[in-house]
């Protein structure tokens, strides 16, 4: 994760634990309102159904590994999500296309990932409006799985 960058807004994996392991640098996690700072070699297990977010507090890149148990369809969400993110001219300012793509991805994985609190409500409203102007450009779960 680049210097000073935040991960996704507070979110929940209702069916999965997410284990964060810092390989290089430092990672700040927020889980259920509690701040956890992880240094190189440290790990933390965010249990299923726990609202969490993370950021890199350093002025240099942080490398970390996130493991999901069980994996379910996380590979689909990450591959298609990063494809959408990387296709944006400014990934720090979500476009209508990116919002529609993420809305489509979340519908494909049926409740395996959801935004926590207000960001979820705001996202739902923006996605409904954005769908009036554009269609998703990411693969469906079925097409993604067929490509392996």
Residues of each region from the PLM?
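Jelly-roll (double-stranded beta-helix
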Residues: 5-10, 14-16, 29-148
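Structured binding elements
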Residues: 20
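A cytosolic small-molecule/anion-sensing beta-strand core signal
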Residues: 23-24
């Amino acid at each position: 994760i680049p210097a000073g960058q935040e991960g996704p807004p507070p979110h929940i994996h209702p069916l999965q634990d997410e284990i964060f392991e810092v390989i290089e640098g430092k990672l700040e996690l927020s889980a259920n309102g509690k701040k956890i700072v992880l240094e190189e070699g440290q790990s933390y297990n965010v249990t299923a159904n726990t609202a969490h977010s993370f950021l890199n507090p350093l002025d240099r890149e942080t490398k970390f590994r996130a493991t999901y148990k069980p994996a379910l369809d996380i590979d689909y969400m990450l591959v298609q999500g990063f494809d959408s993110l990387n296709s944006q001219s400014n990934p720090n300012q979500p476009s209508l296309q990116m919002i529609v793509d993420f809305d489509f991805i979340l519908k494909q994985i049926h409740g395996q990932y959801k935004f926590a609190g207000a960001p979820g409500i705001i996202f739902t409203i923006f996605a409904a409006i954005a769908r009036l102007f554009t269609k998703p450009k990411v693969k469906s779960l079925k097409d993604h799985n067929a490509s392996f």
